[in-house]
């Protein structure tokens, strides 16, 4: 599959469960990153959201984490090929286990299927279903990792947003 091309960068997405999609691109374009110096993308996948934020902001550090090894490797390769490679970092780890600094902006296009048929592909199940990251676990991670004046931006379908709030 061909790379997804933006004006200043491209995103390779072969070998990952979730390809570049509308939800991630919308979140990357919509999130207010005007004052963020440290940014965390939970469930980075290909790294598209982190890349868009690195392009749009003056952030000193943008970290993308993903529990899936193939996704973290893909994001790392996309980060290395970008003009912001010195700002971006990909880490293979779950949101529940990730520790360290506090972030001014945390973003997530989380898995949101709760009560639906699981995919036969375990990578796709992890990327799409809340089996590895529930909304409660996401909340706890955000509260633990966000700076006192930080912001949290996420994108969910309407029916899941009602459940999330």
Which positions does each model-derived feature cover?
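Short, amphipathic alpha-helical segments
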Residues: 69, 104, 129-132, 136, ...
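Conserved donor sugar-nucleotide recognition element shared by glycan-biosynthetic enzymes
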Residues: 20, 24, 46, 71, ...
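Hydrophobic alpha-helix-in-membranes signature
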Residues: 109-110, 156
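Conserved SAM/SAH cofactor-binding pocket of Class I
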Residues: 26-108, 114-119
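Mobile active-site "lid"/loop adjacent to the S-adenosyl-L-methionine
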Residues: 110-137, 141-145
């Amino acid at each position: 599959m061909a790379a997804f091309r933006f004006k200043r960068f491209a995103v390779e997405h072969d070998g990952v469960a979730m390809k570049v999609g509308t939800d991630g691109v919308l979140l990357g374009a919509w999130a207010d990153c005007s004052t963020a110096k440290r940014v965390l993308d939970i469930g980075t996948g290909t790294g598209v959201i982190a890349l868009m934020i690195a392009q749009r902001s003056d952030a000193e550090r943008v970290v993308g984490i993903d529990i899936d090894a193939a996704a973290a490797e893909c994001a790392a390769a996309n980060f290395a090929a970008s003009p912001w490679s010195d700002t971006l970092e990909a880490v293979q780890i779950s949101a529940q286990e990730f520790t360290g600094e506090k972030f001014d902006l945390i973003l997530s296009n989380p898995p949101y299927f709760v009560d639906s048929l699981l995919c036969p592909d375990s990578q796709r199940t992890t990327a799409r279903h809340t089996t590895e990251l529930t909304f409660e676990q996401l909340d706890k991670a955000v509260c633990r990792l966000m700076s006192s004046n930080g912001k949290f931006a996420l994108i969910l379908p309407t029916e899941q947003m009602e459940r999330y709030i």
